[in-house]
Each structure stands twice: as structure tokens, then as C-alpha cells.
């Protein structure tokens, strides 16, 4: 499979772009464990062209994590084009357009999945971004706005005609948000459409490499993208069996990388999300107070001390 000039091996599994999750530390760890491609947190086009510092920082990438994509979102055509030009200068391998984020603060303003209610503008943005940059442009979207508007089959053809190099489909509508089950049947139908020649990447309800393999076998997609199941679990991209202590080592490393590459305050905030979600602490009796302490820690030393206490108790 290829996206532009970027080649992948068989059955590639990607890390999805996620706000406050796919910072550089987490991306580097996911890459180490086998993620075929990683994406930055999504980037607001409006904030980018206004030169907002925290947004500009999201463009920082490392050669170690390649291939890497930067995803942008917005509702204004000119802003999306200008943002894409800025992103191109950051040197990613791919620019991805987010037409799938369902959260109210994004979709409610007409961006992300909100574009599913304005297909002409979605196509205009896509066409103009493709024309404005030399990097491969890809799109991530959903099946439609709701179950009365399952438009993905036609939309995939329209986006392909705009010149995108790959399409990621999350198997839910915007109205579903993250409830119910992802419908991979429609993703498979898009892949089997004889008019479609770009890679189709499936996304939704993938919790392991075994489930990714089933998606490849059943629906014939070119790649699988994993999102929420990666929280606190960068080793999900590997079949390697890790001990509790090894997993704790990895989470401590994530903390150190984030503090070093971002700053202590925000690095801790980013790492807390993974500590709150990681499966390694689930089911541990009498763990509530320890969890609260982890999520309240304000310095790296305090958080490392708490994790060492956990290691002593459980490792």
C-alpha cells in the first residue's frame, strides 16, 4: 500500500490523531511498538494562521516517528488552505483533513464532522488544499451525519475525484458520537467499489491486533487505524507480551519524554490522560486513592514517586 510516495508493508496499523493524546512522546512510543504511521493531535486551522503558540507547538515532529501525518480542521476554505501551507513547511509525510470529529465544540461550529452537513464546502476545501500543497492530502470522516444520511459511498468517490491519496472512514455517524457499534459493513462496501482506487483505512472499535486482522480479512481494507484503545497502551501495536513492570516503565518513559519535549506542567497533564485510561491499573483493589494522587500530582518527581510506590506494591 502507498499513500503518495510513502510505502507501507502488509496490513499496516495506524495511530489515529487525537486531541491531548497523540503528543510527540506517545507517538514515539507507538512507533517503537510497531505503529505503521502516526498522526499529531489535530490542529485548528484558525489557531494556526493566528500563530497561537500552543497550536504551533503541535507541528513539532521527529524523524524517528516517520511516516507521520499532521491533521488540520476548520470550516473556512481560505483558512484551511493557508493552514495546509503552514503545515507543509513543518515537513510531515501527509496532510490529513479532519471531517470526522463529532464533538460539539468542533462539529457544532461546522468543522470536523459538521462538514457532513455541507458537502459542497467539504469538497471545495479538499480540492483547494490538494491544489495548494505538494504533499499527499488525505481525509478522515464518518459514514454520514445520521442514519438517514449514510452518504459515505458517494462521498468517497467525490473526495477521490478531488485528488486525495487515501480515505479513513470511522464506522459511525456524527449523531452516534462514540456510542453503539462501528459499522464496518459500509467501510467494506466503499473498499469494494470498483471506482475506488485510493487506499481505504478503516477505523472504529479496534482494540487489538487480532481485531485489526479480522477487519483486514473481513472487509479488505488497506489499513486499520486504532484510536481510543491506544490510551495508556502504546504497546497495543505489538504482539509482545509485557510484564506489569515493563508497562509501568513505558508509562514512566512517556512522562519523561513529555516533560522534556513540552514542559513540566503540560507534559504531566498529557501523561495523566494515559495514566487514567491505561488498562494496567484496572481491577486493582483499593486503588482509588492512588489513582486520585496520580491525577493530582503537579511535578514530575511527585508523579514518579507515586508510580514507584505502585511498582513496589504490585510489581
Locate the predicted segments by residue.
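Aromatic- and acidic-residue-enriched carbohydrate-binding clefts of CAZyme catalytic domains
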Residues: 116
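Alpha/beta catalytic cores of nucleotide-metabolism and tRNA/nucleoside-modifying enzymes
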Residues: 1-9, 19, 24-25, 124, ...
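Glycine-rich, positively charged N-terminal anion/phosphate-binding segment
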Residues: 2-4, 9, 18-93
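Hydrophobic faces of well-ordered beta-strands that scaffold small-molecule active sites
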Residues: 13-17, 38-40, 68-72, 95, ...
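Alpha/beta enzyme core
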Residues: 81-111, 120-198
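Active-site beta-loop-alpha junctions enriched in small/polar residues
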Residues: 18-20, 43-45, 73-75, 100-102, ...
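Short glycine-rich, flexible loops that bind phosphorylated cofactors or substrates
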Residues: 47, 104, 233
Amino acid at each position: 500500500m502507498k499513500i503518495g510516495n510513502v510505502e507501507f508493508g502488509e496490513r499496516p496499523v495506524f495511530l489515529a490523531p487525537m486531541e491531548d493524546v497523540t503528543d510527540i512522546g506517545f507517538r514515539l512510543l507507538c512507533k517503537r511498538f510497531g505503529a505503521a504511521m502516526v498522526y499529531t493531535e489535530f490542529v485548528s486551522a484558525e489557531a494556526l494562521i493566528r500563530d497561537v503558540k500552543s497550536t504551533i507547538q503541535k507541528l513539532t515532529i521527529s524523524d524517528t516517528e516517520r511516516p507521520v501525518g499532521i491533521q488540520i480542521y476548520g470550516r473556512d476554505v481560505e483558512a484551511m488552505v493557508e493552514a495546509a501551507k503552514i503545515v507543509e513547511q513543518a515537513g510531515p509525510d501527509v496532510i490529513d483533513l479532519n471531517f470526522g470529529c463529532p464533538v460539539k465544540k468542533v462539529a457544532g461550529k461546522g468543522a470536523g464532522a459538521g462538514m457532513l452537513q455541507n458537502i459542497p464546502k467539504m469538497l471545495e476545501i479538499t480540492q483547494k488544499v490538494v491544489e495548494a500543497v505538494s504533499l499527499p492530502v488525505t481525509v478522515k470522516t464518518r459514514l454520514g451525519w445520521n442514519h438517514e444520511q449514510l452518504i459515505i459511498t458517494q462521498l468517497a468517490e467525490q473526495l477521490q475525484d478531488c485528488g486525495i491519496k487515501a480515505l479513513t472512514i470511522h464506522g459511525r455517524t456524527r449523531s452516534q458520537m462514540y456510542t453503539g457499534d462501528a459499522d464496518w459493513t459500509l467501510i467494506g462496501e466503499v473498499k469494494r467499489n470498483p471506482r475506488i482506487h485510493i487506499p481505504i483505512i478503516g477505523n472504529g472499535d479496534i482494540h487489538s491486533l487480532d481485531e485489526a486482522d479480522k477487519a483486514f480479512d473481513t472487509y479488505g481494507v488497506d489499513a486499520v487505524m486504532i484510536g481510543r484503545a491506544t490510551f495508556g497502551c502504546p504497546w497495543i501495536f505489538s504482539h509482545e507480551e509485557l510484564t506489569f513492570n515493563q508497562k509501568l516503565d513505558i508509562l514512566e518513559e512517556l512522562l519523561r519524554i513529555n516533560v522534556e519535549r513540552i514542559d513540566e506542567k503540560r507534559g504531566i497533564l498529557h501523561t495523566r490522560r494515559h495514566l487514567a485510561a491505561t488498562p494496567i491499573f484496572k481491577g486493582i483493589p483499593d486503588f482509588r486513592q492512588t489513582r486520585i494522587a496520580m491525577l493530582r500530582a503537579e511535578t514530575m518527581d511527585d508523579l514518579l514517586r507515586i508510580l514507584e510506590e505502585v511498582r513496589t506494591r504490585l510489581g
